[in-house]
Amino acid sequence: MPRLTRRRALTAAAALASGAGAGAGAQAAAAPGAAAHDHGSPDVPLPCSLLDLLPLLPLLLDEVIKGRGIQGGPHRGGGHHHGTGYAVFLDGVELHVMRNADGSWISVVSHYDPVPTPRAAARAAVDELQGAKLVPFPAN
């Protein structure tokens, strides 16, 4: 996975925003009544402008802790969870994180130690691993 930086995030956001505007116009022209019946299908791009993505910048994670590269950000779909989640990568390997009902976060490495943010979960995993490599977590 390429290194996630703010520049890449903003570039992707700009491309997504310009593509969402073009796609929404074509979709409305093709089916005028379809927009009124949309119930948030995951195929419909959510952000309509770059300004809509600015609140997500603090959620982007790209840092080095104790020599380990940590990247992460909001992620749609994948795994057995529904809706929008958060993906965290430790040295390019996905660290499975999950949000609890109370808003705290856990990871597959520090499952019994909930923390307030995905960033804190990644940092706790780095501490727990003590330099060991993260083994990919199987999907099934």
Swiss-Prot record:
UniProt keyword Transcription, yes or no: no
UniProt PTM comment: Predicted to be exported by the Tat system. The position of the signal peptide cleavage has not been experimentally proven.
Transmembrane segments: none
One example of a Gene Ontology biological process annotation: melanin biosynthetic process
Pfam families reported for this sequence: MelC1
Signal sequence, start to end: 1-36
Keyword set, alphabetical order: Copper, Melanin biosynthesis, Signal
Molecular function GO labels: copper ion binding
Functional note: This protein may function to deliver copper to tyrosinase.
NCBIfam families: TyroCdyMelC1 (NF047833)
Family assignment from sequence similarity: Belongs to the melC1 family.
Protein name from the UniProt record: Tyrosinase cofactor
Classification lineage: Bacteria, Bacillati, Actinomycetota, Actinomycetes, Kitasatosporales
